């Protein structure tokens, strides 16, 4: 019974990003080596919207803001080709492998409509839309 309690507590306190093990590389920034991943195991489709997690893992630790990676829960509309990050978590370790030390919510007013096909934002949204079909 103690073991079951331990695992329940551990699972509850781990951030979502660490619980997932299906992060797939979407693109790597050729200028700075940063990588963006998408969690292919948790893409949800509701009406004309999709919901998914992405992760930015920097090549180097960000000394200015004291983090290494960021995970974000995203809402997207593939027909109108836009997305917004509903929740953003900052992590002190690579690949979101520790509990988030900072969380932002209520970012739904920031809508991103990528135009350039070679931009990271465009590639992320196109990949998520393709995977949701």
Residue spans for each PLM region:
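Sec-dependent N-terminal signal peptides
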Residues: 4-18
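N-terminal secretory-pathway/extracellular module detecting exported/lumenal segments
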Residues: 19-72, 77-133
């Amino acid at each position: 019974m103690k073991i079951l309690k331990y695992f329940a507590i551990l699972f509850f306190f781990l951030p979502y990003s660490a619980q997932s093990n299906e992060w797939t590389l979407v693109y790597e920034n050729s200028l700075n080596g940063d990588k963006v991943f998408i969690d292919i195991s948790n893409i949800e489709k509701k009406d004309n919207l999709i919901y998914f997690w992405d992760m930015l893992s920097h090549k180097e630790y960000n000394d200015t803001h004291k983090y290494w990676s960021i995970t974000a829960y995203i809402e997207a509309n593939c027909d109108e080709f836009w997305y917004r990050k509903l929740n953003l978590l900052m992590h002190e370790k690579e690949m979101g492998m520790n509990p988030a030390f900072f969380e932002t919510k209520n970012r739904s007013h920031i809508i991103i409509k990528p135009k350039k096909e070679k931009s990271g934002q465009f590639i992320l949204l196109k990949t998520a839309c393709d995977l949701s079909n």
